[in-house]
């Protein structure tokens, strides 16, 4: 199955055919660095990180460009409030962004350009637009003339006349059309500025991305991504600028991730339901947040709530618990790298063997269907269930069963590398989650282990009543015991 991508421009899933065979160019709009990133930023960046990883996994040489908008009204306002230079603000929050993304396990893009490093390219594109009649200078500002570009608004499917008729646009005598947008803003007293043919000033937001994407990916490239909120006006304006300047298609596949709601409501500072990544990671493990994001299709809205985060953590615990059990069974054993041909397997082993044989093809089938990470995780959970059944049935390991367990670990490492998941040592990850949960409980891990040991001794002595009492006591405290041939483990419910 060929990779198909939902293209906002066509409204359909289009087969991915890169501009240059074997290569893929992708540009994703980065953050405006004036504050800490919120969970909406987490979703966008995790989504396109997985797309970047999967393209590479599929054999493409990927050039991934994700920019920083490091000059903007919001940055200037923040600098004025704090009485510092705008670069102090931008550098502070670029560093904070990088820290947040590292905690979420993101791979570094190929290039991370900053707008202020590309003023020459920005000015050059604006000059071209003026020369071609698509832009005009007005009192030190430069505006894009939207009526000069007949296909304006084709990405969002809007109608310019309808927008003008229903718009509440502030009258601006410097504009020929109320919908015209700024390419260059003349400088104001006390604001940072750069020299240009139209006087000192700074670029508009939209032209920055056009210039930076052209520099690193060319006049036409494969994939442009961002949140749905960027379709209009940002991406619409990027198309108008870039195609008018270059006379060719700008982007072949437009991708947009869905919104993040908070307890079924739109995230908003005014509603008091605005959460930064840092605030969320004070309560939840970074991999749990990543798993939560990937548990839904990237185009669907997701509802951020404690219940849904706890459900995501429980799902991730199921996978890590399975992998920890596999590690325990293989510990100290000579594990064959290849299946042992002709060796007998118990019924659950035959089922597991069958699941593993098709796992990669089914994983790829899900990911090739517009990067359906929710379906891909479903394939992995099937393998977890089959592995757990096999582990419950198996006694002493044989070369054939050990080879099967080794295959489980290799396949989860392979798929996990694509998703940016399962990167921790399973036992250590589970222990850290237990510790975080137990910090909020009335019973310590040491006390739990003592009771488990007492229960084991009681069962050895055939005192099953006492064993059941201990199990029920722990259950009342939210501790669930899990018995297996390898011993007894526990989870916090």
From Swiss-Prot:
Originating gene: cysS
A molecular-function term among this protein's GO annotations: zinc ion binding
Position of sequence motif 'KMSKS' region: 266-270
Record-given protein name: Cysteine--tRNA ligase
Catalytic reactions of this protein: tRNA(Cys) + L-cysteine + ATP = L-cysteinyl-tRNA(Cys) + AMP + diphosphate
Subunit structure: Monomer.
Family matches, as InterPro entries: Cys-tRNA-ligase, Cys-tRNA-synt_Ia_DALR, Cys-tRNA/MSH_ligase, Rossmann-like_a/b/a_fold, tRNA-synt_1_cat_dom, tRNAsynth_Ia_anticodon-bd
CDD domains documented for this protein: Anticodon_Ia_Cys, CysRS_core
The organism of origin for this protein: Pelobacter propionicus (strain DSM 2379 / NBRC 103807 / OttBd1)
A cellular component term, taken from the record's GO annotations: cytosol
Residues the entry annotates as binding Zn(2+): 29, 209, 234, 238
């Amino acid at each position: 199955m060929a990779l198909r991508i939902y293209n906002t421009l066509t409204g359909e899933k289009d087969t991915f055919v890169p501009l240059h065979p074997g290569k893929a160019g992708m540009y994703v709009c980065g953050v405006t660095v004036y504050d800490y990133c919120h969970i909406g930023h987490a979703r966008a960046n995790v989504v396109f990180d997985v797309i970047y990883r999967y393209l590479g996994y599929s054999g493409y040489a990927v050039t991934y460009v994700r920019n920083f908008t490091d000059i903007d009204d919001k940055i200037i306002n923040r600098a004025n409030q704090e009485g510092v230079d705008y670069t102090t603000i931008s550098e502070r929050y670029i560093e904070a962004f990088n820290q947040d993304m590292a905690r979420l396990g993101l791979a570094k893009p190929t290039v991370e350009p900053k707008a202020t490093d590309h003023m020459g390219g920005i000015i050059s594109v604006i000059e071209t637009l003026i020369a071609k009649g698509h832009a005009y200078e007005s009192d030190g500002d430069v505006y894009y003339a939207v009526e000069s570009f007949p296909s304006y608004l084709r990405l969002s499917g809007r109608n310019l006349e309808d927008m003008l008729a229903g718009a509440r646009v502030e009258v601006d005598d410097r504009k020929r059309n109320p919908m015209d947008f700024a390419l260059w803003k003349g400088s104001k007293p006390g604001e940072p500025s750069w020299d240009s043919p139209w006087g000192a000033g700074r670029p508009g937001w939209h032209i920055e991305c056009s210039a930076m994407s052209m520099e690193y990916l060319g006049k036409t490239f494969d994939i442009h991504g961002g949140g749905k909120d960027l379709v209009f006006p940002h991406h619409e304006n990027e198309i108008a600028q870039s195609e008018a300047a270059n006379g060719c298609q700008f982007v072949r596949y437009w991708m947009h991730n869905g919104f993040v709601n908070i307890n079924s409501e739109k995230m908003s500072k005014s509603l008091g339901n605005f959460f930064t990544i840092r605030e969320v990671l004070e309560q939840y493990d970074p991999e749990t947040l990543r798993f939560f994001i990937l548990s839904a299709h990237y185009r669907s809205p997701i509802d951020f709530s404690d219940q849904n985060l706890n459900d995501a953590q429980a799902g991730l615990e199921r996978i890590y618990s399975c992998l920890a059990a596999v590690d325990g069974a293989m510990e100290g054993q000579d594990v064959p790298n290849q299946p042992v041909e002709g060796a007998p397997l118990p019924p659950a082993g035959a089922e597991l063997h069958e699941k593993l044989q098709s796992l990669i093809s089914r994983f790829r089938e899900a990911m090739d269907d517009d990067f359906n990470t929710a379906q891909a995780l479903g394939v992995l959970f099937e393998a977890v269930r089959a592995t757990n059944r096999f582990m419950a049935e198996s006694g002493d390991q044989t070369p054939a069963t050990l080879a099967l367990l080794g295959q489980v670990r290799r396949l989860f490492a392979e798929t996990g590398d694509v998703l940016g998941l399962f990167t921790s040592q399973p036992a250590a990850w589970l222990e850290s989650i237990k510790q975080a949960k137990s910090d909020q409980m009335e019973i310590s891990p040491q006390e739990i282990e003592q009771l488990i040991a007492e229960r084991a001794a009681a069962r050895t002595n055939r005192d099953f009543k006492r064993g059941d009492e201990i199990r029920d006591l722990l259950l009342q405290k939210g501790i669930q015991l899990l018995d297996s041939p390898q011993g007894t483990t526990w989870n916090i419910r």
